[in-house]
Amino acid sequence: GLWGALVGVLKARFGIHEVISGIMLNWIALYFNNFMIGMSWLKKPQTEASYEVLPSSWIVILNEWKTSDAGREWLLDGTHPILGDVLIKTDLNYGIFLAIAAAFLVWFILNRTTRGYEMRAVGSGSEAARFAGINVNKNIILSLAFAGALAGLAGAIVITGAMPHRITTLTSQPGYGFDGISVALMANTSPLGVIASALLFAGLQYGGSSIQADLGAPSEIINIVIGTIIFFIAMSGAFRMLADYLGKR
């Protein structure tokens, strides 16, 4: 939340675009992460990563049962192929329920609270919101702090919900943020629409890996499909303008 608030301060006080400052601050966070992992009390010997987080903090669904002999026998006996694929081949965890709850929380705040109304007003037009007496700078900082908190929650889910349950030294950014932008565009920035678009995005990405492994087809095909979907969604406004223009002729 504090990292997102810093982006908000840069936007509100100095007019620095949040995407630009966010990318730059992400690199600062990446190198700070690498610095911290290099500390002797945090770095696991003979590795470039931290120690694993405590197993009690893992949020993998049925983790102990599916790794037991009885669980593996039940999942791999061929009578439950879908459950076997999902539970054995993926790191399905309770983070999916947290994400859905977060989407509903964001929807409620934006559509059922005064603060949410002010945030939407500032996002739609900061000058009009300022003229209406809304504190634009405060709402910019609060909205980006809230976004940063959600990003922090996602990071915690990645560590506690997926192998290897530790923080590694990074040489580049994983790109989750840009995936998030793509998902938001596919949902037309609707908090509840994000649930469906995220599942579609994840399904396409997972399907791309399966296509590459099973058929030998290039996974770039899925990236082309995703890019095409996002392109036409982003162009929807232009299509409406074109339709209005042609309708007036």
Label the predicted regions.
Residues 14-16, 134, 189, 217:
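Membrane-helix interface residues
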Residues 1, 26-34, 38, 94-108, ...:
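Hydrophobic core segments of alpha-helical transmembrane domains in multi-pass membrane transport
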Residues 145-151, 157-227:
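Transmembrane alpha-helical segments in multi-pass inner-membrane proteins
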Residues 69, 87-166, 191-192, 196:
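Helix-loop-helix "hairpin" substructures at the membrane interface of multi-pass membrane proteins
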Residues 22, 26-110, 221, 248:
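Transmembrane helix-bundle core of multi-pass membrane transporters
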Residues 124, 131, 135-138, 208-249:
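Cytosolic-side transmembrane-helix boundaries in multi-pass membrane proteins
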Residues 11-13, 110, 186-187:
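Helix-capping/transition residues at the boundaries of transmembrane alpha-helices
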Residues 1-26, 105:
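Alpha-helical transmembrane segments within multi-pass membrane transporters and channels
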